[in-house]
């Protein structure tokens, strides 16, 4: 049998999705599963977006331009300017979700063996995209004790080598919910300017900043405009994860020219998704305010509840809709798997994302999980009670020697495939 690629073998399993087979099996057993593992908002999609989808009247669903519909790019330009992000239509490339924007940014700027410095924990798919580009993620550790603030800039300096091409941030942050301050952003600006690096800035959660301070984009940093590669997506702000529409924004003309080549190779971003996204930019202000206020309430409810559970600790996230929580367990991976495979409380269990998958450094995040507050407060309350009961119960000793990560997930996946 032919061998698969080294790249395929190195590709990490998603900490967000790898336990889905166990969750599906739990549901088959009649267990109610509270999904705190994935950033899939439950807020309704804006009606203007849904109406645009319903009223599509085309005889042919044709390719769009490789860089995206001009009308959408114009709308996006106007949207960014509301946040004092001064970009032109030609700076904006529409992508198949924010994920493709990250991938194309890496493919167009990195050669095999090049390095990107990333504060960890970080969005797990960054590692997958770096592997796809043949590049290397170099982690710089942030810690739960400081609320996952930006590591000291000297720690970044120590990691810079001749192969370093850029620094990647997510602001507000997934998975931690941290929001970088003006001072921290200025320090990053000075660093990338000093070493002539790219600053890749994933800003898909910009609407969800809870400090009251002005939102700071990488494009607000003077003197590095052509070094900024901004990543965006409509998925989170409009509850439109399924339409797969994002954007890569750059003022670097040579970079844009090369990104367009990758766009042409994949032909076209989703036509129907672009139509919905364009309409959704006109979502009324009260929709965005309702969404914002809902997440503010959920955040307080969840963090207060987590910190009342003995042994649990969550910092207060300042943005996005996630928090990273330390649990009183030795192995959060096993605990999360056990919650789905063997534990239930009154017919319910909880699905969380083990935080170790958001770290590049082996051994870090071993007792941490990422929790997304994307379900209603009533369900969050029930999920917190289930978590409390699961921690009280603990993984039975008889199960500790079982290879849940390998045998059980593999068995469940096979059983699901056989069941059709």
Residue ranges and their predicted role:
Residues 66-68:
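Short beta-strand to alpha-helix junction loop
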Residues 36, 59-62, 75-78, 82:
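Glycine-rich loop-to-alpha-helix module at the N-terminal edge of alpha/beta enzyme cores
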Residues 2-4, 8, 12-14, 19, ...:
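PLP-dependent class I/II
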Residues 390-419:
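Flexible loop/hinge segments that line or gate small-molecule binding clefts
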Residues 70, 74, 289, 293, ...:
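Generic detection of well-ordered alpha-helical segments
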């Amino acid at each position: 049998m032919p061998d698969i690629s080294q790249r395929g073998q190195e590709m990490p399993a998603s900490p967000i999705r790898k336990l889905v087979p166990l969750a599906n099996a739990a549901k088959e057993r009649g267990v109610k599963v509270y999904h705190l593992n994935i950033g899939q908002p439950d807020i309704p999609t804006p009606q203007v977006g849904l109406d645009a989808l319903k009223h599509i009247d085309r005889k042919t669903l044709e390719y769009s331009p490789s860089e995206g519909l001009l009308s959408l790019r114009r709308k996006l330009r106007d949207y960014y300017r509301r946040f004092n992000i001064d970009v032109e239509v030609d700076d904006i490339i529409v992508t198949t979700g924010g994920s493709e924007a990250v991938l194309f940014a890496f493919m167009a700027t990195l050669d095999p063996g090049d390095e990107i410095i990333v504060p960890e924990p970080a969005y797990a798919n960054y590692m997958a995209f770096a592997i796809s580009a043949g590049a290397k993620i170099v982690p710089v550790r942030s810690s739960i004790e400081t609320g996952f603030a930006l590591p000291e800039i000297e720690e970044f300096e120590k990691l810079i080598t001749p192969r370093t091409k850029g620094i990647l941030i997510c602001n507000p942050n997934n998975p931690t919910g941290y929001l970088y301050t003006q001072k921290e952003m200025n320090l990053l600006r000075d660093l990338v300017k000093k070493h002539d690096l790219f600053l890749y800035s994933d800003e898909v959660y910009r609407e969800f900043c809870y400090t009251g301070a002005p939102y700071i984009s990488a494009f607000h940093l003077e003197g590095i405009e052509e070094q900024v590669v901004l990543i965006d997506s409509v998925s989170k702000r409009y509850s439109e994860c399924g339409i797969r529409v994002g954007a890569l924004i750059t003022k670097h003309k040579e970079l844009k020219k090369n990104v367009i080549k990758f766009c042409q190779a994949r032909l076209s971003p989703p036509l129907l998704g672009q139509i919905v996204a364009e309409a959704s930019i006109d979502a009324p202000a009260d929709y965005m305010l309702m969404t914002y206020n809902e997440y503010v309430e959920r955040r307080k409810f969840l963090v207060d509840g987590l910190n009342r559970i003995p042994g649990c600790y969550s910092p207060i996230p300042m943005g996005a809709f996630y928090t990273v929580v330390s649990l009183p367990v030795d192995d959060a991976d096993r605990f999360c798997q056990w919650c789905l495979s063997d534990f239930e409380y009154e017919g319910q269990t909880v699905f969380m994302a083990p935080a170790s998958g958001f770290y590049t450094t082996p051994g870090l995040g071993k007792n941490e999980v990422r929790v997304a507050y994307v379900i209603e407060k009533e369900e969050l309350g029930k999920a917190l009670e289930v978590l409390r009961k699961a921690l009280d119960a603990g993984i039975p000793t008889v199960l500790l020697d079982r290879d849940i990560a390998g045998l059980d997930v593999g068995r469940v996946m096979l059983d699901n495939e056989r069941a059709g």
